[in-house]
């Protein structure tokens, strides 16, 4: 049985831990509000950009893939896939990083089983550390995440430039972005979003979207595609990074709230054990005193 001194030390230690987890929960909650506002503000722009690019791309159907921009049609082959994985630089966020890495590994394993060549570009230290252990020969580079700071568009520009450079050099044929889409503080959904080639609706007879139907393109669609495809790639990556940042803070706030609750329960259990031990010691002392008095 643990002594009273040991139990007091354990209670003090758990209380100190609870102070830390409570503080981290409050910090994550304050960051979550800002990150959520940024992610929600970026969604309409990214969605509108995606619809407009799909409208432009539909005008190029039937053309030879070799004559189209590679960011639109890829290289015309389906052999080498680049998988960009967005995770965080910091831990203590529950299953946030584990879930996205699991989704990325499922995608990579599926592609490998189909005989594809896979290259991985991890963004964020936590995901990179895991992926390097499982696929050391597939890692092309390791990029730092936002490290808890506001996500900058320059990071999305850098990632987009790397993808475009690899595509132009013929090093990859397709690219998929794996990230956590933010729903709320408790829910983040792993998403596998194709970046290259550009996703275009398959149904030629589908009614045009109310927004995209109003577009009139000047100059011609091909010229606009060449100019806008790099920007669209950057916008989609930036939007995903904002979603990931909001999801990270939501997951961390939830994890620290659960940790604080568990710490409180542990303190209650230890306090009960401490009181029972103290009462038992007092009872034993009384028995010894009474027994001694009777002996006299």
Swiss-Prot record:
Compartments where located: Cell inner membrane
This protein's GO CC annotations: plasma membrane; proton-transporting ATP synthase complex
Keyword annotations of the record: ATP synthesis, Cell inner membrane, Cell membrane, CF(1), Hydrogen ion transport, Ion transport, Membrane, Transport
Family note: Belongs to the ATPase gamma chain family.
Keyword Aminoacyl-tRNA synthetase assigned: no
Described purpose of this protein according to its UniProt entry: Produces ATP from ADP in the presence of a proton gradient across the membrane. The gamma chain is believed to be important in regulating ATPase activity and the flow of protons through the CF(0) complex.
Principal location: membrane
InterPro entries for this protein: ATP_synth_F1_ATPase_gsu, ATP_synth_F1_gsu
Alphabetized NCBIfam families for the sequence: ATPsyn_F1gamma (TIGR01146), PRK05621.1-4 (NF004146)
Topology versus the membrane: Peripheral membrane protein
One GO molecular-function entry: ATP binding
Subunit structure: F-type ATPases have 2 components, CF(1) - the catalytic core - and CF(0) - the membrane proton channel. CF(1) has five subunits: alpha(3), beta(3), gamma(1), delta(1), epsilon(1). CF(0) has three main subunits: a, b and c.
Gene Ontology BP terms: proton motive force-driven plasma membrane ATP synthesis
Protein name per Swiss-Prot or TrEMBL: ATP synthase gamma chain
UniProt keyword annotation of Endoplasmic reticulum present: no
